[in-house]
Amino acid sequence: MSTTRRDPPVRRRRFAPPMPPTPPPSRPVRVAPPGTTLALRLSIALAVVDAIAGLVSVFVPDVFRDDPAYAGNARGTYTVILLVALPAMVLAMWASVRGWLRANLVWLACIGYLLYNAILSSFSLRFNALFPLYVASLSLAVASLVALLRCIDAGMLARRLSPRVPVHAVAAYLMVIAVGFALLWLADIVPALLAGTVPASLRGTTLTTNAVEVIDLAFTLPLTLAAGLWLWRGRAMGVLLAGTMLVFLTLEAISVATDQYFGHLADPSQPTSAVAFFVVLAAVGALPTVAFLRGIIEPLHGPTARRA
């Protein structure tokens, strides 16, 4: 009886699919907030307008038709705009496009500072050749502010704030500044109302009202107080507003110290007591400002970003 010899079955080797090559490590790229293109374009236009106005103000002082002290104040303000505010805003715009959250706060604050001074220039300075630029700056600053605010996620900012940030101390600082300057301005206004005269800040000037007091009491100080209260209560909008107002107040303190010094240079009869006060205020305000900005934990994202 013959048997057929069968070879043992060949066991097929099962191969694992080849592993894809490991990509080289790459540095994560931060993502810009969606919709920043419009804010960028408006802010670039704002920077160009203010740069032109600043250069003319600093190097062609005869453009002003105001008394020497007030013209000196304006030159001091535009010196700060040229040397501090505009470089800070351009740097913040560059960083924001690359996704740095804290840069948005600096950008907002710089726009707010330029808006503040556009209002002062438009309504306080005597009509001069730069008036169209003052109006253009006012319009562009408002548009830039609105466009940028639409791009910022206050909730993300709040979630990214480090628990190490002394929020109650920062909030208290903001509320003290708001209440303190409100009392200072009211001390100038209320006695004049009761006596039926003009405030002391207007005596010896050609101004009909004090535009600084108007802007501060109507906008700056209420926003500063709201920032402090909301931050104290842990609201997301408080983080956005507090960070913005901290940078703004520091910029404004530097600006006032500088414009008062330039006013004294133009008219030595003008006191310099405010210079030292605002230098100290700027130095003190820089401490919570830096601590707050450093306390924002920057997120890392994928390699692409969409900008509308």
Q: Where do the language-model regions lie?
A:
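C-terminal transmembrane-bundle signature of multipass membrane proteins
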Residues: E213-A308
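Hydrophobic cores of alpha-helical transmembrane segments in multi-pass inner/ER membrane proteins
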Residues: V80-L91, S137-R150, F219-A226, V280-G295
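Membrane-interface helix-loop-helix junctions at boundaries between adjacent transmembrane segments
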Residues: L91-A147, A154-V165
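Alpha-helical transmembrane segments of multi-pass integral membrane proteins
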Residues: L42-A53, A136-D153, R164-P191, V212-T220
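Short, Lys/Arg-rich, polar N-terminal cytosolic tail immediately upstream
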Residues: S2-G35
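Membrane-interfacial loop-to-transmembrane alpha-helix junctions, especially the N-terminal start
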Residues: A39-L40, V97-C110, M237-M245
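Membrane-interface interhelical connector segments
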Residues: P191-L207
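A loop-to-helix transmembrane entry motif
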Residues: Y70-T79, L202-L223
